[in-house]
Amino acid sequence: FYYLNSFFSKFKLKEEEYMKDNAKIEICLEDVESVIRAEKGGADRVELCADLFEGGTTPSLGTFITARRHTTITINTMIRPRGGDFCYSDVEFEAMLEDVKAFKEHGADGIVFGILNIDGTIDKERSRRIIEAARPLSVTFHRAFDMSKDLFQSLEDLIDLGVDRILTSGGEPTVMEGIMNLEKLVEKAGDRIIIMPGCGITESNFSYLKDRVKAKEYHVYLPKEEVSKMEWRPGHIYMGGMLRQPEFQIVHTSEERVKTIVEKK
């Protein structure tokens, strides 16, 4: 009995060490097919958005419900009523609250949002209302954080608000450019809040970033372009504006790329 107990104690310690050393991987995506592929690839969680061309906006409720029906992976939903800045009108904020309630009612695991004042500080009053509406779901403050005036003051504000994690590139366009700030943010945050690096993470830089920053979670976009099945292709018509994506290329999450990242964690 003693040896058996000793064996299980050692096994438990090794399991705890494994969980401590292995970071969680969140995949950023915008469609049901991608959620399915992310789960098959071994991701821990997904951030479900619409319109990643705009940096991610609120997905449709139908997209979320279908993704929830076909997968068991943790799904956090983006709450962002439009592209552009993060200072919202009263009716835009009202829409955000309604979206939080709707996703919560239909089984979302968490929400992702970000609201700033016109001076670049965290809008604490509106953020508090979003968080109250979302609980007990997980709450992530997205890269509006990187657009704030003072990263470290914003960090303290979000900790005071009780936010669970911050998605950030360290106040720079990509994680590799913001790596020094990310190191400082992780150290400053300690166990008070999760700092989740994201934007520009690839299979080739993930291991280096993880070893440097030592974050517990990472946010990754791993697309794969696929050729449309359409045979009839009127090449002179576009659904977008001046900056447009090809109409006959479909972008989904790459299951293979997810597996590659997961193996490195």
Predicted regions located by residue number:
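Active-site-adjacent beta->alpha loops and helix N-cap segments on the catalytic face
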Residues: 53-71, 117-133, 148-153, 172-186, ...
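Alpha-helix-loop-beta-strand connector modules within alpha/beta enzyme cores
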Residues: 57-83, 124-141, 181-202, 248-265
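Glycine/small-residue-rich loop that forms an oxyanion/phosphate-binding "nest" at active or ligand-binding sites
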Residues: 74-127
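Active-site mouth loops of central-metabolism enzymes
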Residues: 20-30, 80-95, 140-150
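Catalytic cores of alpha/beta
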Residues: 33-35, 88-98, 149-160, 201-216
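Hydrophobic faces of well-ordered beta-strands that scaffold small-molecule active sites
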Residues: 23-27, 46-48, 75-79, 111-113, ...
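C-terminal alpha-helical cap/extension of soluble enzyme domains
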Residues: 192-265
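Glycine-rich phosphate-binding active-site loops on the catalytic face of alpha/beta enzymes
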Residues: 47-54, 106, 112-117, 163-175, ...
